[in-house]
């Protein structure tokens, strides 16, 4: 699911505001079966095959897992444009952006399962196979200055200051 909204407002002549909000989510579920196969001779006698690529019944397994990722985005910026004396065209823009992501995963596994039943069943142990969770965020401040003289000479200056949760606190913020 994805949802995005944009708000644009003309505050004054030449001064505009734009804000955006966004959300997206992704869900995934997985069922995995690793089942044993019984091998027989033509006369119906079971074959005990140690070299089989399929597990013995007690080593068969069924794993059920699910994962979810949520992403949030918000940004806002102001833009100012003005032409002075029909020669000096100036544009200023400044803003902020925030991105946040969260991930959740869990998996459960059952051993020694019955092949005919597709659920977490079994005579053996049922246990948590894996649990994982993480979050990350980025906050950014940015700006731009454009100057244009009679559409002949142009200068542009950009700056951006970012902070990320992926880095250690002493390295978290940088240009």
PLM features: what roles do these ranges have?
Residues 5-23, 80-94, 147-155, 166-169:
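Secondary-structure transition into beta-strands, especially the periplasmic turns and strand N-termini
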Residues 12, 29-30:
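Substrate-binding groove/exosite segments of carbohydrate-active enzymes
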Residues 20, 24-26, 69, 75:
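A general, composition-driven signal for non-globular sequence regions
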Residues 23-29, 82, 96-104, 159-165:
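Transmembrane beta-strands of outer-membrane beta-barrel pores
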Residues 35, 39, 45-152:
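Outer-membrane beta-barrel transmembrane domain signature of Gram-negative proteins
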Residues 68, 169-170:
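Ordered, soluble secondary-structure elements with a strong preference for glycine-centered loop motifs
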Residues 174-175:
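Feature captures outer-membrane beta-barrel proteins of Gram-negative bacteria and organelles
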């Amino acid at each position: 699911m994805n949802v995005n909204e944009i708000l644009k407002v003309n505050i004054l002549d030449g001064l505009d505001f734009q804000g955006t909000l966004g959300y997206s989510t992704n869900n995934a579920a997985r069922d995995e079966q690793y089942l044993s196969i019984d091998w027989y001779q033509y006369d119906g006698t079971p074959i005990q095959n140690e070299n089989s690529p399929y597990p013995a019944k007690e080593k068969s397994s069924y794993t059920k897992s699910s994962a979810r990722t949520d992403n949030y985005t918000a940004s806002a910026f102001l833009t100012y444009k003005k032409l002075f004396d029909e020669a000096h065209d100036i544009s200023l823009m400044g803003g902020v952006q925030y991105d946040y992501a969260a991930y959740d995963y869990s998996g459960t596994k059952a051993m020694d399962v019955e092949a005919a039943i597709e659920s977490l069943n079994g005579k053996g142990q049922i246990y948590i196979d894996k649990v994982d969770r993480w979050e990350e965020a980025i906050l950014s401040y940015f700006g731009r200055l454009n100057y244009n003289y009679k559409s002949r000479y142009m200068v542009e200056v950009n700056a951006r200051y970012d902070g990320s949760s992926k880095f250690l606190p002493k390295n978290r913020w940088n240009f």
